[in-house]
From Swiss-Prot:
GO biological process: intracellular protein transmembrane transport; protein secretion; protein targeting
Keyword Thylakoid: no
Quaternary structure and partners: Component of the Sec protein translocase complex. Heterotrimer consisting of alpha (SecY), beta (SecG) and gamma (SecE) subunits. The heterotrimers can form oligomers, although 1 heterotrimer is thought to be able to translocate proteins. Interacts with the ribosome. May interact with SecDF, and other proteins may be involved.
Membrane topology designation: Single-pass membrane protein
Extracellular topological segments: 56-61
GO cellular component, one term: plasma membrane
Descriptive protein name: Protein translocase subunit SecE
Location(s), subcellular: Cell membrane
Amino acid sequence: MAELQERIRHFWKESRRAFLVTKKPNWATYKRAAKITGLGIILIGLIGMLIRIVGILILGG
């Protein structure tokens, strides 16, 4: 039981330290992250669509 409490205490300490180091992103950083995420989603969708089209053409739908 003491080991579990020590592990929880250590986790809390490390999490708190990481939280204090982080900062809220500014608007430009947020927009850049949103654009990159959106482009990634679109790219994955296009790849999936191309795989589906190739599958339909090869297997005959």
